[in-house]
Amino acid sequence: MSPASLSPALSPLALCCALLLSGCGDGAGTGPTSNGAVRTLTLGAYTTPREAYGKAIIPAFQRHWREKTGEEVRFEESYLGSGAQARAIVGGFEADVAALSLEADVEAIARAGLIQRDWRAGPHRGMVTRSIVVIAVRPGNPKGIHDWDDLGRPGLDVLTPNVRTSGGAMWNVCALYGAALRGGTSAPKGDAAAAETLLGAVLKNVRIMDKGARESIVNFEKGVGDAAITYENEVLVARQSGQDSEYVVPRSTILIENPVAVIDANAEKHGNRDLADAFVAFLASPQAQRAFTDYGLRPVDETVAAEVRDRFPAVQDLFSIRDLGGWPEAIRILFAPGGVYERVVASLNAQP
């Protein structure tokens, strides 16, 4: 059952419970070993890397752990929009590991006292994958969409998720607004008012705001909309499933960096902190990093990045969230009450 198919009246915690999947990977993780040891690890993740975890990463870790310790590992997996997943964990969903879209969502869990160690202390400051924000278009690009400004043309139908539930949606807004501030659109460089105007023009064309990036791209694959603002890897995964998917890389776009963290309070309660730590460490290994690239995600490991460089198009002006002052500043300017996003939406709602 996908999140989109659930009743909207369900709370994030109820959603997580409904979406828990027993992830057995290669099928060997369900029975006891010769010494009878079977352990369980619960992963709470955002929607985008579902295939990467379920089909590649988790089975590989199960084999790794079995060879190292003789123990079988059974995974329970929950996939929601990043913000919804973070709120579910804070609200009582006992994930041992959180793999989310943005560090602000991990920080929300830390502020609730559930993460007690410095989750950024590991390799790559706690980041496990990268991507970029791109524009998915119809085969042959019949609408002639080439950059951010094109998404604001009257008459277009655009898809992007809801920023209240989706980390991907927040990345999308940061990409468009940041590109405008940097002179990567028709807006004059450094002109915040013009950047806000462009964001409004694009949001005016948004037809559907789904709960997560995965639901958004699935609707696009079903024929809804002319374009979708999305993670690059979502389009690449769609191609793997047989979709005739194309995308445009804006000349200026943001580098997406996705964090992972052990939820200390839950792992301690479940007696599996060693297992959770080992899984997070495994995600940084060359084996796992290569597996992520097989599902369209860009690696954080520089050696692996060099190996797969030809798979991913270059970006003329690639910036990071740090260029917007970091997540606390981006949230204050863009997503806090009275911020850019709220002002734009209020203005659009006030239009006849």
Question: Can you describe what each PLM-predicted range is?
Answer:
Residues D26-S166, N349-A350:
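N-terminal segment of the mature folded domain
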Residues G44-T47, V137-R138, D157-D191, V202-V206, ...:
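Short beta-strand->loop
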Residues A267-P352:
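Extracellular/periplasmic juxtamembrane helices and adjacent flexible linkers that interface
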